[in-house]
C-alpha cells in the first residue's frame, strides 16, 4: 500500500507520503478494521492498486451502520492497466459490501463520518470525493453512483486575523465567555477511533449569568495531511450552539474567539467543511473571512 500511495498523482486533499506506521495509526489499528475489506490488485507480485471497503458509523457515533457501506479509498498505480484495475477493484468492493448486508455504498464518507483515512485524505473531514480526485470521480461515474450533495471546504489564513467587532458582538461579549480545553474528553466512540491520537482543542461558550454551557466548537491538527501543505493547520468540527443562543449572534463570537486563540498559538490555517445547503454555517464562516477553497461531492450507489 505504501508503494501504491507513493505513485499517486498529487492533489491537495491527498497526503503526499505515507508509511507503514501511519497506515497502522489511521487504518489497521481501528477496532472495526476487517482485513476482508482490504482488497489488493497484484501482477507478478507487483502492486497495481487497492480498495478499502468498510461501513459508516451511525448517527450517534456509537456503532457501525452496516447497511451503509463506504468505499474508503481506491488507489491505482497509473499506467496501461489503470482503468481495468480500478474497475475490478470497485466491483470487488461492491460485491463484498453487498454480501455483508449493505444496502447503499458511499464513496469516501457518509458525511461527516468517515471510518478511516482522516488525516490522509480530504482535510478537516473527508468530504466524499475530494475535488481534483479524478481517479475516484471516473470510477464512481462508471459504476452509476449518484450525487447527493456538495460539501464546501472553507479555509482561513490566520495571518492578521481579526474577529468581528460591532455593537452586537460587544453585547454578546458581556453576556458570554469562552473556555478553552486542550486534549478534551472524547465525545463519542467514533471520535475516539478517528481522532483519539491527534492533538485536539475544544472551545465552550459559557453563559456568564448562570455558568451554563450554551455551545462548543472543536479543532484537531489534521496530521499528517497538513504537513503536506507546509503550514501548521487545524480543522474545525462539531460546531454546536443552542438554538436560542444562536439567535443572539453567539456563534460568531464562539468561532471568532476560538480562531483568535488558535492564531495566538501560531496556528497558520483553519479549515472547515459543511454542506452547501447549510446556509447559516456558510454565512458565519464567510462573515469571519473564510473563503471557499474547494468542493467535495457526496455520492451513493443503491444496492437494492
Describe the residue ranges of each PLM region.
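Conserved beta-strand in the GNAT
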Residues: 38-40, 46-56, 70, 204, ...
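A short, internal acetyl-CoA/4′-phosphopantetheine-binding micro-motif in the GNAT/acyltransferase core
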Residues: 71-83, 109-113, 238-247
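Short amphipathic alpha-helix that is part of the acyltransferase structural core
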Residues: 1-26, 38-40, 146-153, 160-195, ...
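A conserved beta-turn-beta hairpin within the catalytic core of GNAT-like acetyltransferases
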Residues: 57-71, 81, 223-236, 246, ...
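Conserved active-site alpha-helix within GNAT-family acetyltransferase domains
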Residues: 99, 112-147, 252, 276-294
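Conserved acetyl-CoA-binding loop-helix of GNAT-fold acetyltransferases
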Residues: 81-98, 241, 247-264, 282-287
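A structural microfeature
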Residues: 49, 144, 149-152, 214-215, ...
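Conserved hydrophobic beta-strand within the GNAT/NAT acetyltransferase core sheet
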Residues: 105-107, 236, 270-274
Amino acid at each position: 500500500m505504501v508503494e501504491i500511495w507513493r505513485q499517486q498523482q498529487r492533489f491537495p486533499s491527498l497526503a503526499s507520503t505515507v508509511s507503514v506506521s501511519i497506515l497502522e495509526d489511521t487504518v489497521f489499528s481501528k477496532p472495526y478494521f476487517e482485513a476482508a475489506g482490504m482488497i489488493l490488485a497484484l501482477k507478478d507480485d507487483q502492486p497495481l492498486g487497492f480498495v478499502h471497503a468498510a461501513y459508516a458509523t451511525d448517527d450517534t457515533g456509537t456503532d457501525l451502520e452496516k447497511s451503509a457501506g463506504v468505499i474508503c479509498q481506491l488507489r491505482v498505480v497509473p499506467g496501461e492497466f489503470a482503468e481495468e484495475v480500478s474497475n475490478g477493484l470497485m466491483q470487488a468492493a461492491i460485491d463484498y459490501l453487498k454480501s455483508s448486508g449493505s444496502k447503499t455504498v458511499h464513496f469516501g464518507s457518509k458525511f461527516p463520518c468517515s471510518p478511516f483515512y482522516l488525516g490522509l485524505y480530504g482535510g478537516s473531514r473527508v468530504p466524499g470525493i475530494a475535488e481534483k480526485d479524478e481517479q475516484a470521480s471516473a470510477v464512481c461515474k462508471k459504476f452509476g453512483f449518484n450525487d447527493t450533495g456538495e460539501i464546501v471546504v472553507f479555509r482561513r489564513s490566520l495571518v492578521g486575523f481579526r474577529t468581528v467587532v460591532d455593537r452586537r458582538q460587544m453585547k454578546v461579549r458581556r453576556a458570554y465567555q469562552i473556555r478553552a480545553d486542550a486534549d478534551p474528553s472524547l465525545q463519542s466512540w467514533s471520535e475516539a477511533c478517528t481522532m483519539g491520537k491527534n492533538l485536539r482543542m475544544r472551545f465552550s461558550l459559557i453563559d456568564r449569568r448562570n455558568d451554563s454551557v450554551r455551545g462548543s466548537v472543536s479543532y484537531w491538527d489534521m496530521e499528517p495531511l497538513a504537513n503536506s501543505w507546509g503550514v501548521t493547520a487545524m480543522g474545525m468540527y462539531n460546531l454546536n450552539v443552542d438554538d436560542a443562543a444562536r439567535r443572539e449572534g453567539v456563534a460568531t463570537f464562539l468561532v471568532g474567539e476560538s480562531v483568535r486563540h488558535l492564531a495566538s498559538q501560531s496556528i497558520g490555517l483553519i479549515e472547515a467543511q459543511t454542506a452547501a445547503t447549510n446556509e447559516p454555517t456558510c454565512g458565519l464562516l464567510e462573515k469571519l473571512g473564510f473563503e471557499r477553497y474547494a468542493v467535495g461531492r457526496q455520492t451513493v450507489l443503491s444496492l437494492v
